[in-house]
Amino acid sequence: MAKDVQVMLRQAVPGLGKPGEVVSVRPGYARNYLFPRQMAVRLTPGLLKEQQMRREQEAARKLAEKQQAENYKKALETIGRFVIRKKVGEKDLLFGQVTASDIAEVVLATSGLDIDRRNVLLDEEIKKTGVYLVQVKLHPEVTATLRIQVTPE
């Protein structure tokens, strides 16, 4: 019986794996199906080293991104309050409401940090003046809590 060969997948193969994974397959399957369709390459020591190096670089990049997000979190939380001025009617009710875009704009104006409005997590609608706590997702593992003060214009 033929011995299985080790290949690295270049693209997703149903039932086999994702790109970059090392899998064992029968030689005929590799030679007749995977190699001609450029779906996989034969695993060599050089390719293995290259893949290991890529993984290390990716891990270092992710760690640097998380560290940067932690630094942004500290900077945002030391600012204290972000003030948003809105037109107010009776009983301190706003005309409209404070949106995630408003919060992203005031953070940019105050701290210089450009955050995406989709990363601003509003637990409740802000329709009155006052102080509110708002979560901002800076990284999948890092969330900052901002104090937003809504005041009349």
Curated annotation (Swiss-Prot):
It holds the Pfam family Ribosomal_L9_C. One of its GO terms (molecular function) is structural constituent of ribosome. SUPFAM superfamilies: L9 N-domain-like, Ribosomal protein L9 C-domain. Keywords: Ribonucleoprotein, Ribosomal protein, RNA-binding, rRNA-binding. One of its GO terms (cellular component) is ribonucleoprotein complex. It comes from the Bacteria. Belongs to the bacterial ribosomal protein bL9 family. Binds to the 23S rRNA. The keyword Ribosomal protein applies. NCBIfam families: L9. The keyword Hydrolase does not apply. One of its GO terms (biological process) is translation. This is Large ribosomal subunit protein bL9.
